[in-house]
Amino acid sequence: RVLCHGDSYSPNFLLSEQEEMSLIDWEYSGMGDPAGDLGTFIGCSNYSVEQAEKVLEIYLQEVPDTKTKRHYLAYVAVTSYYWFLWALFQESVGKPVGEFLYTWYRFTRQYGQLSLELYLGEK
């Protein structure tokens, strides 16, 4: 368990003119699995699976073994589902979230299926 941001998507990363990066909006932070932050980052993108795997390599600074890869990619499904439910609530109270609703739904299904295949040894 490590300190996790909990809402690690691109608008919360600020880059100064000196190219120093800051991470803002810590309201969802707490101790947790670092795969959750990367799962949210990928889940809030429109990356293909191949691009997501490259992001994972960059994040880990190495090519992950199968166990690590499936763990992190499963978190894309888990966090996408979490944010999908959040989005449904927002929509229900008149606060549209735009295309994120569909992206999170799609990634929940896509990465959930991929992760299941990886856990079952089918990929």
Pin down the residues of each PLM region.
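An alpha-helical support segment within catalytic cores of ATP-dependent transferases
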Residues: R1-G6, E17-Q18, P64, T108-Q110, ...
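ATP-dependent phospho-/nucleotidyl transfer catalytic cores
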Residues: R1-L3, H71-A74
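ATP/Mg2+ or Mg2+-diphosphate-binding catalytic cores
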Residues: L85-K123
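Active-site activation/catalytic loop segments of kinase-like enzymes and analogous catalytic loops
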Residues: A35-P64, A77-K95
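Conserved short-loop catalytic and cofactor-binding motifs
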Residues: W26, G43, Y72
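Short amphipathic alpha-helical segments and their helix-coil junctions
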Residues: E53-H71, Y111-L120
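Amphipathic alpha-helix face/heptad-repeat signature
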Residues: L73-S80, W104
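Active-site acidic catalytic loop and adjacent metal/ATP-binding pocket
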Residues: R1-G36
